[in-house]
Amino acid sequence: MKILKLLLLIISVTSVVNVCLAQSDAVSPMDTTIYGRNKAAGKFIKTRGINLYYETYGEGEPLLIIHGNGGSINNFIYQIPYFAKNYKVILADSRAQGKSVDKGDSLSYEMMTDDLNAMLDTLHLNNCYVIGWSDGGINGLLLAMRHPDKVKKLAVTGANLWPEATAVDPFIYNWAKNYYDSLKKLPPSPNNIGNIKLIRLLAFEPHITTKQLQKIKCPTLVIGGDHDVILPQHTMLIAQSIPNSYLWILPNSGHSTPIFYREKFNTEIDNFFKNLYRKIDGFGRFN
């Protein structure tokens, strides 16, 4: 069971830092940060059958930041202090993750997306900027499709549209399916049920078509690493399918762009939010 838990950590967004720091006998900054357990900044919202935990930082235009599979608010230790200088940063532990406990059997990206929309309604926010990492990027895309009035501008990194080897690195895709099968064979327990729900998302979700992406009208920055878990050609397809989009592929980068390329990541997204979207066509393509 311990081995299975370790494997789950490897795929989670926090694991990259944890594994690297473990090799040097260091402690992950995500384990010691106040973010994700800040009593002064955190609250619960009772919505859609769960108590959704969220934290807010800073003042200014609202900015929603969404974590990935098995993650939490503390995954954004490098984004919160940067963006809180000029934005009101809102982060939630997605359903069935972090402090947002969900004892139900089902979990989907659509459920998590509608949770976030309900949270924005509760906070009386008509619209906001959005950053999504990994599964959080999927939620960001769905938020822009299902609740288009809520998203002013969107930046996603490491998102995918479907659970196939054409989108996800074949090694990771096959691992997720095999791990799901292994978990299903274990005796049921609250912890195991939670892990099954999360791994099922990796192995069998989402199901978004390129035609659906064309419904996204807000300016969108699509980000990925050239050695990302999400294949670069799939990231390019996402950008090509969204009418008002930019594409940014980081060289020598994997899936954890907000961590290992945090300075570039933060400044590039900040500039994208602050500047008008520029439609590039015709002779403008020579610029």
Feature-to-residue mapping (PLM):
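Alpha/beta-hydrolase fold catalytic core
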Residues: 3-6, 19-61, 274-287
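Conserved HGGG/HGGXW glycine-rich cap/lid loop of the alpha/beta-hydrolase fold
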Residues: 50-99
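Conserved hydrolase catalytic core segment
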Residues: 126-164
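Active-site nucleophile elbow and catalytic-triad environment of alpha/beta-hydrolase enzymes
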Residues: 196-212
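Short beta-strand/loop motif that positions the catalytic acidic residue
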Residues: 216, 222-224
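Conserved loop-alpha-helix segment in the C-terminal half of the alpha/beta-hydrolase fold
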Residues: 226-253
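Catalytic active-site module of serine/aspartate enzymes centered on a nucleophile-bearing elbow/loop
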Residues: 252-287
